[in-house]
């Protein structure tokens, strides 16, 4: 029983069906979002500040102002599209990861093309990030727009979507998808790579909450490397509002603008709260996925018996 509980379903050679990973990934996404929603709202508010890094508003000030002016419910602004985003993203991410992982293992068996375990996880994770971004991006953009709204009155997801389509066209729902694709695919690939690296390092040690610990370290590592890309993604999603311009600019132009006006550290606004949010999210996501998958497989085996 214990060996089943501690099985690494993300390792190279693990056999997981698309149905199993789809269901476990959906559960994982829903739980992870419910736990970390307020931190996500605070992170987005910090990332959208345009002042120089030294004159940035602190996390404490952002939280105090938000609670004072908008009420505690504002910590969950954008939660509806975000919950949909996380469920869809979790399902797409883990299903794609297991599918690519199986394909790479099959390729190794048939052609002799054999990637090291770390590269196997990195490639599978990066592919999972690309597919997940394509599937869920409009919800990511809506989540950002709603969380960034500083008015006390809450905006609806459908109303915000209609406003974007009306003023920016249907493609407005995909504003910033290029930096998002780069940011998310890189982050996801590094997260799975880090997770497997830590699990291999720990080996068979019986450590409580082992999957969560590995996920926490993986989340912190991947976010630390790719955070500037995430900041550019958020700025691109909010460009029309932040810069009062209907014209879109490329990621490199926006990068240069941030560095010129806010300094290099401007790319790291909200980094602390982001790590505080991303690390627990990765921990919960990977922990819940592993145990949900183990439970689903046990139920399936009992049904077959």
Swiss-Prot record:
Kindly state one GO CC term assigned in the UniProt record: mitochondrial inner membrane
* PROSITE patterns (alphabetical): SOLCAR (PS50920)
Chain positions of Solcar repeats? 16-103, 116-201, 206-295
Paired cysteines (S-S): none
Q: How does it sit in the membrane?
A: Multi-pass membrane protein
Q: Where in the cell is it found?
A: Mitochondrion inner membrane
Which GO BP terms sit in this record?
A: mitochondrial thiamine pyrophosphate transmembrane transport
Question: Which InterPro entries would you find in this protein's record?
Answer: Mit_carrier, Mitochondrial_sb/sol_carrier, Mt_carrier_dom_sf
Ordered alphabetically, the record's keywords are: Membrane, Mitochondrion, Mitochondrion inner membrane, Repeat, Transmembrane, Transmembrane helix, Transport
Q: List all membrane-crossing ranges.
A: 16-32, 84-100, 122-142, 169-193, 213-229, 270-287
Any one Gene Ontology molecular-function term assigned to this protein's record: thiamine pyrophosphate transmembrane transporter activity
Identify its protein family. Answer: Belongs to the mitochondrial carrier (TC 2.A.29) family.
| Role of this protein | Mitochondrial transporter that mediates uptake of thiamine pyrophosphate (ThPP) into mitochondria.
Q: What is this protein called?
A: Mitochondrial thiamine pyrophosphate carrier 1
Source organism (scientific name):
Scheffersomyces stipitis (strain ATCC 58785 / CBS 6054 / NBRC 10063 / NRRL Y-11545) (Yeast)
Q: Which gene encodes it?
A: TPC1
